UniProtKB/Swiss-Prot annotation:
It is found in: Secreted. Its main location: secreted. Belongs to the three-finger toxin family. Short-chain subfamily. Mambalgin sub-subfamily. The lineage of its organism: Eukaryota, Metazoa, Chordata, Craniata, Vertebrata. This is Mambalgin-3. The keyword Chaperone does not apply. It comes from Dendroaspis angusticeps (Eastern green mamba).
Length: 57
């Protein structure tokens, strides 16, 4: 996963994705921490990529 921190990211370029790191605990609500914007984003168990800052795909 390639994430690039750009300070406090609010928007990403149209062709980029918001990269989040999942620090959620089992049996609890997931907590996603915004890592930055990336043009190449791959999801894993602990990483999530979204097209918006609200993580609404």
């Amino acid at each position: 996963l390639k994430c690039y921190q750009h300070g406090k990211v609010v928007t990403c370029h149209r062709d980029m994705k918001f990269c989040y790191h999942n620090i959620g605990m089992p049996f609890r609500n997931l907590k996603l921490i915004l890592q930055g914007c990336s043009s190449s984003c791959s999801e894993t168990e602990n990483n999530k990529c979204c097209s918006t800052d609200r993580c609404n795909k």
